Amino acid sequence: MPLLTIGDQFPAYQLTALIGGDLSKVDAKQPGDYFTTITSDEHPGKWRVVFFWPKDFTFVCPTEIAAFSKLNDEFEDRDAQILGVSIDSEFAHFQWRAQHNDLKTLPFPMLSDIKRELSQAAGVLNADGVADRVTFIVDPNNEIQFVSATAGSVGRNVDEVLRVLDALQSDELCACNWRKGDPTLDAGELLKASA
């Protein structure tokens, strides 16, 4: 399946996830208390930043996940939910988070796409059967507004994902390198100036 692109509807999903937050503070009576089911219907009216990484216990992936974690409040301020996805099990996610200092207090859920259904539907699976490093920004109408994919050896720029979300939410024409608070482009004024 080809990679989904701008204007496509993001696929429906129902996946087991490791909950977000400081796992050491969860009042868990049994292992299942660390997990939840997350569906595509869970965040109505919200923007979603859905990012896929190849595998847990790798080298580039935790740097990206930690970067999303550091900016989580910024995304929340923009009414956007971050959802991280890989083909690893929820138990692998748990073990990785428990062992990696930068992931221990991750504020958003880590979804397990162990059956590869969402990864396949989104077109992010590579020839090795793992997800490529892909980020989607999905609007409140479930329409994809941004897609970014990088080589496995290159981490994504989370600041750029936030910048693009700001630009999309401005609903204006935004020039190259535009940042929230910068003036937007006025097409009418630009047309007058060029006449």
Swiss-Prot record:
Enzyme Commission code: 1.11.1.28
Keyword GTP-binding on entry: no
Cell compartment(s), UniProt: Cytoplasm
Function comment: Thiol-specific peroxidase that catalyzes the reduction of hydrogen peroxide and organic hydroperoxides to water and alcohols, respectively. Plays a role in cell protection against oxidative stress by detoxifying peroxides. Together with AhpD, DlaT and Lpd, constitutes an NADH-dependent peroxidase active against hydrogen and alkyl peroxides as well as serving as a peroxynitrite reductase, thus protecting the bacterium against reactive nitrogen intermediates and oxidative stress generated by the host immune system. Does not however seem to play a role in detoxification of isoniazid.
Keywords, comma-separated and alphabetical: Antioxidant, Cytoplasm, Disulfide bond, Oxidoreductase, Peroxidase, Redox-active center, Stress response
Gene that encodes it: ahpC
Occurrences of domain Thioredoxin (ranges): 4-170
Keyword Transferase: no
Quaternary state and interactors: Homodimer; disulfide-linked, upon oxidation. 6 homodimers assemble to form a ring-like dodecamer. Identified in a complex with AhpD, DlaT and Lpd.
Annotated GO biological process: cell redox homeostasis; hydrogen peroxide catabolic process; response to nitrosative stress; response to oxidative stress
Outcome (variant: C176S): Retains about 10% activity with tert-butylhydroperoxide. In reconstituted in vitro system retains 30% enzyme activity
Phenotype when changing C174S: In reconstituted in vitro system retains no enzyme activity
Transmembrane segments annotated in the record for this chain: none
Annotated Gene Ontology cellular component terms: cytosol; peptidoglycan-based cell wall; plasma membrane
Additional remarks: The active site is a conserved redox-active cysteine residue, the peroxidatic cysteine (C(P)), which makes the nucleophilic attack on the peroxide substrate. The peroxide oxidizes the C(P)-SH to cysteine sulfenic acid (C(P)-SOH), which then reacts with another cysteine residue, the resolving cysteine (C(R)), to form a disulfide bridge. The disulfide is subsequently reduced by an appropriate electron donor to complete the catalytic cycle. In this typical 2-Cys peroxiredoxin, C(R) is provided by the other dimeric subunit to form an intersubunit disulfide.
InterPro entries: AhpC/TSA, Peroxiredoxin, Peroxiredoxin_AhpC-typ, Thioredoxin-like_sf, Thioredoxin_domain
Induction comment from the UniProt entry of this chain: Induced in isoniazid (INH)-resistant, KatG-deficient strains as well as in INH-sensitive strains when challenged with the drug. Increased expression in these strains probably compensates for loss of katG activity in detoxification of organic peroxides. A possible member of the dormancy regulon. Induced in response to reduced oxygen tension (hypoxia). It is hoped that this regulon will give insight into the latent, or dormant phase of infection.
Record: active site: C61 (cysteine sulfenic acid (-soh) intermediate)
Primary localization class, coarse: cytoplasm
Protein name: Alkyl hydroperoxide reductase C
UniProt GO MF annotations: hydroperoxide reductase activity; NADH-dependent peroxiredoxin activity; oxidoreductase activity; peroxidase activity; peroxiredoxin activity; thioredoxin peroxidase activity
Catalytic activity: N(6)-[(R)-dihydrolipoyl]-L-lysyl-[lipoyl-carrier protein] + a hydroperoxide = N(6)-[(R)-lipoyl]-L-lysyl-[lipoyl-carrier protein] + an alcohol + H2O
Entry's family note: Belongs to the peroxiredoxin family. AhpC/Prx1 subfamily.
